Amino acid sequence: MQVVVPFAATEPKTRLADVLTPAERTAFARAMLADVLTAVVEAGHEPTVLATAPLDLETLDLEAAVRDAGSVAVDDRPLTEAVNARLPERGDGGDDGTHIDPVAVVMADLALATADALEALFSAAADVAVVPGRGAGTNALVVDHPEFRVDYHGASYLDHREIAHDVGATLETVDSFRLGTDIDEPADLVEVLVHGTETDRAPARLREFGFELERTDGRVTVARLEESRPK
């Protein structure tokens, strides 16, 4: 199985602009990417970062084994086109024209991803397995059908269900809190601090920036220490 991790190498995570500077967003995005790559390798696979611009894995905080297992492919096309170019076609996996090698697509902002969560996705038996995100997006999927293609515009999870039906592919929805939580908005940062582990890079980066959990009216939010705020 090929595992592709799309990554916006320039100007990442713009929806976090209200709480992070451009440099901080870049550092945080790369920390999340490093955590995702680590989880993929721990799940027994070799990830390919599908980056919008050149990216040196040496610049990421990665263990040597993870760095050596990974690779980078540069494709500056929109996400849908770039991913579709990586999906299997009939005959990709064998000479008889029938077998194909499945392709998994795992987004780089799944900061809570673990090897166990990924293994549950990778082991799904359907032609197409999808982990929906909040708001009907698609956070991760595995494609084992030569005619299925992605469409990441709008409510992509609903679109992917329809596309699978149209091409005659079986589909399984994989219910996963860890893979279903993508980090896009300031409110999402609380999930990183609550559920991240001590060895994860993303929560460590947020703490370096001065973020901490704050309890107000029975709810947990994040707050940034005043002295750590950019001037």
UniProtKB/Swiss-Prot annotation:
E.C. number(s) listed in UniProt: 2.7.7.68
GO molecular function terms attached to this record: GTP binding; phospholactate guanylyltransferase activity
High-level lineage: Archaea, Methanobacteriati, Methanobacteriota, Stenosarchaea group, Halobacteria
Catalytic activity: (2S)-2-phospholactate + GTP + H(+) = (2S)-lactyl-2-diphospho-5'-guanosine + diphosphate
Record text on subunit structure and interactions: Homodimer.
InterPro entries documented for this protein: CofC (IPR002835), Nucleotide-diphossugar_trans (IPR029044)
Membership in a protein family: Belongs to the CofC family.
Protein name as catalogued: 2-phospho-L-lactate guanylyltransferase
Sorted UniProt keywords: GTP-binding, Nucleotide-binding, Nucleotidyltransferase, Transferase
Pathway as given in its UniProt record: Cofactor biosynthesis; coenzyme F420 biosynthesis
A biological process from GO: F420-0 metabolic process
General function of this protein: Guanylyltransferase that catalyzes the activation of (2S)-2-phospholactate (2-PL) as (2S)-lactyl-2-diphospho-5'-guanosine, via the condensation of 2-PL with GTP. It is involved in the biosynthesis of coenzyme F420, a hydride carrier cofactor.
